[in-house]
């Protein structure tokens, strides 16, 4: 299956990349003179040899000069590839230039974008720098495409300023562009926002255009935003509404926005394109949705392997299913991209650029690209799911057969409900829907490679220069000649040792002096040109003649022939999956870089305004934004003499170190906990030791003063006892003067009252106690840091090298403290 797809990809001039071991070979002779270079032609170029239908051809030939357009617009149309107008262009452009309100309906891909672009450019006053024309589109991709068409046609108009305003871009950039903008193209949401912020002045708008008007004015879609924008525009303006489909209710509703509108409707009873063959395939229905998806995917792979095509669009009704299908096709050897509404703006624009520049063969999409997207190389459209309405179906299949060309559409539907829905759509649109033949014949696609395309592989910005342009025939000849020369050269070396040198070996030695530099396929973009079937047949004949003519007495052995036959399939162009075009460089991130990347994704990746109110930077620094209801707490370390004596015993030193490490993490990593409950703080300061260990979480053991007899082991512990006794006495005095509040009440009050009352009591009753208590344990923490700073313990340095371990330790400490706090 994949091999057949690769063969069709070679016919459709897919961008291919060959491994380095097959490219870096010895060249025996100079290359022959290359043939004429084919020119890339656009879909609207009627002079190309592509087949055209009556959708774009006129009974009597006409040109744009007969429309009395300005000279810069005529030159721009010619430069953009528009040589002769289509029927809708010939009828609508003169009416629009007269200032009439128009409702234009024509088939997909017949030049409707060129209609309003030409009208807009011809009515523009370049000396007036204010915004004169406003164009709205339902999706960002359509807005970007309209902007590209206007700039292409207006290339000869000096000083033209046309900008696109869509979501996902900074408002500051839009504000700067609107200072000098003749034509504003955008989505309804962003345009409304710009008007509300007074960045866009609607009073200067003279022409208001709705592209895909049926979608913009659909109830529950953009109707409220369109009404708001329309009400802010001046009354004396011209309005154009353009679309391929118009439901009956919408045609009547549009008259409310316009003054005596003129209808330009071509083939309203037959909206399907003449050059499109429409097929459907009924698949088995299963209770589980993933079983249906698997069967449709298998049929899709079979379709790709049997039908040669230039590019294909596959539509799905679900976002998740589209991404999953793209992954499956890429893993099977079919290069596929995905685009959907849940992707960010950069990813969506990148996928569209790859489709239009022929950097991907298959694009899996939702209905995001079903309207207005113009990719002239697409000649196959597949509906993996039946669309929900007939308008969506007509817009989907309109992505193929652009500007009167030929194309093919296939719709997969399950037996039962989906099949009945597809039949209703066919009856509503009056289309000739045929069942897909089984097996699929090879000649189902009438037009596959009978027009010229130029394909370029995606080149990375950090890549190296690409390989020179070489046709497929020359590459095969190079590979064969190289294998023959290598074989002859090996025989020559063997014969030279036996003092028998043949003429062929001498010739091969002279020819092997030229070498091709080694380049991998990831560093090179190999450019291929499409050839006609006749040329491919000539190539095969020339290959066979070359095989018969280059055989020498040295190469008559069966081993050499077998080697050439085995090397040929490997040397043929392969179609790698899309991931092979991307260079994945190994890179190790630190914990700080991971945190920075995560915060960048949270703030910008989701396209939502997100403000980070708390930054955790370590055990000694907790930075909080005071504007969000918190207080910026930062431990200010002061130099205090070390209280612990160096003559402490090993057991007491270990106890003090373990206690100090726990307390330092509590006082610095979770300072709010130490200040949260006055009762718990009193109990922690008055706790008695158990088994020669001290713990802040232990409840009081009956008395408020600790037993001094258990602390006679070292002077450091005596100092600790005196500090704790003084702290408890001051706490008793403060408790007699102030009303006592229970910890349970502090936890159950409202958040603001709890925060202010709790901190007011702490400041009044424990200011001195907490200061001495904090200074004491800060000295222990400083001593612990100074001790390990001078040590060369590998575990400590590993902990410093991997701060994620320390972060996990502190987070776990806070979590345990909160659990114990709630239990108390």
Curated annotation (Swiss-Prot):
SUPFAM superfamilies recorded: P-loop containing nucleoside triphosphate hydrolases (SSF52540)
SMART domains, A to Z: DEXDc (SM00487), HELICc (SM00490)
GO biological process terms held by the UniProt record: negative regulation of cell population proliferation; negative regulation of transcription by RNA polymerase II; oogenesis; positive regulation of apoptotic process; regulation of steroid biosynthetic process; RNA processing; spliceosomal snRNP assembly; spliceosomal tri-snRNP complex assembly
Annotated GO CC locations: cytoplasm; cytoskeleton; cytosol; Gemini of Cajal bodies; membrane; nuclear body; nucleoplasm; nucleus
Sequence motif DEAD box, residues: 211-214
Record has rRNA-binding as a keyword: no
Pfam family, one: Helicase_C
Localization of this protein: Cytoplasm; Nucleus, Gem
CDD domains, alphabetized: DEADc_DDX20, SF2_C_DEAD
UniProt-annotated stretches for the region SMN interacting: 456-548
Stretch forming the signal peptide: none
Record's compositionally biased regions (Low complexity): 645-667
InterPro entries xrefs: DEAD/DEAH_box_helicase_dom, Helicase_ATP-bd, Helicase_C-like, P-loop_NTPase, RNA-helicase_DEAD-box_CS, RNA_helicase_DEAD_Q_motif
Family recorded in the similarity comment: Belongs to the DEAD box helicase family. DDX20 subfamily.
PANTHER family associated with the record: ATP-DEPENDENT RNA HELICASE DBP3
Binding partners and assembly: Part of the core SMN complex that contains SMN1, GEMIN2/SIP1, DDX20/GEMIN3, GEMIN4, GEMIN5, GEMIN6, GEMIN7, GEMIN8 and STRAP/UNRIP. Part of the SMN-Sm complex that contains SMN1, GEMIN2/SIP1, DDX20/GEMIN3, GEMIN4, GEMIN5, GEMIN6, GEMIN7, GEMIN8, STRAP/UNRIP and the Sm proteins SNRPB, SNRPD1, SNRPD2, SNRPD3, SNRPE, SNRPF and SNRPG. Interacts with SMN1; the interaction is direct. Interacts with GEMIN4; the interaction is direct. Interacts with GEMIN5. Interacts with SNUPN; the interaction is direct. Interacts with PPP4R2. Interacts with FOXL2. Interacts with EBV EBNA2 and EBNA3C.
Protein's name according to its UniProt entry: Probable ATP-dependent RNA helicase DDX20
